[in-house]
């Protein structure tokens, strides 16, 4: 994959529950604490190194932000770091929360 692709929350949900991809949430700590996908890794400048140590470049990565805009830049960055397959989730956490309100965790 030379460029990231955009996927909707239904596709992301399917990949996550099939175990074929990991989900990273790039929102600020306060927004993340107020609600996030339970399986999400909170990816920040401080946690990037740990994420890269724990996930090989052949790991399929899905990036979630607030509305699906900031995730595009982060997805491109992860591709530039060497990840083979990266997706930006259209609609971000707002769309996830609308479609899957029972699949939201709270706290850090």
Curated annotation (Swiss-Prot):
* Enzyme Commission number, as recorded: 2.8.1.1
| Gene3D superfamilies, sorted | Rhodanese-like domain
Show the catalytic activity: thiosulfate + hydrogen cyanide = thiocyanate + sulfite + 2 H(+); thiosulfate + [thioredoxin]-dithiol = [thioredoxin]-disulfide + hydrogen sulfide + sulfite + 2 H(+)
Q: Can you list the GO cellular component terms from the UniProt entry? A: cytoplasm
Q: Which CDD domains match?
A: GlpE_ST
What Pfam families does this protein's entry cite?
Rhodanese
Q: What is its main location?
A: cytoplasm
Give all residue intervals belonging to the Rhodanese domain.
17-105
What GO molecular function annotations does the UniProt record carry, in alphabetical order?
thiosulfate-cyanide sulfurtransferase activity
**Compartments reported by the entry:** Cytoplasm
Q: Which UniProt keywords apply?
A: Cytoplasm, Transferase
The record's listing under SMART domains reads: RHOD
Q: Which cysteines are joined by disulfide bonds?
A: none
GO biological process terms, alphabetically, are: glycerol metabolic process
Indicate the residues that form the catalytic site.
65 (cysteine persulfide intermediate)
Matches recorded under NCBIfam families = PRK00162.1
What is the role of this chain?
Transferase that catalyzes the transfer of sulfur from thiosulfate to thiophilic acceptors such as cyanide or dithiols. May function in a CysM-independent thiosulfate assimilation pathway by catalyzing the conversion of thiosulfate to sulfite, which can then be used for L-cysteine biosynthesis.
The family annotation for this protein states: Belongs to the GlpE family.
* Protein name per UniProt: Thiosulfate sulfurtransferase GlpE
User: From what organism does this protein derive?
Assistant: Citrobacter koseri (strain ATCC BAA-895 / CDC 4225-83 / SGSC4696)
């Amino acid at each position: 994959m030379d460029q990231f692709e955009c996927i909707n929350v239904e596709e992301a949900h399917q990949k996550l529950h099939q175990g074929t991809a990991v989900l990273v949430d790039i929102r600020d700590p306060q927004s993340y604490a107020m609600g996030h996908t339970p399986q999400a890794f909170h990816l920040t400048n401080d946690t990037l190194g740990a994420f890269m140590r724990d996930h090989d470049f052949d790991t399929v990565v899905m990036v979630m932000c607030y509305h699906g805009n900031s995730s595009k830049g982060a997805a491109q960055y992860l591709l530039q770091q060497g990840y083979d397959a990266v997706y930006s989730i259209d609609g971000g956490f707002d769309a996830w929360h609308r479609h899957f309100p029972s699949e939201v965790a709270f706290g850090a």
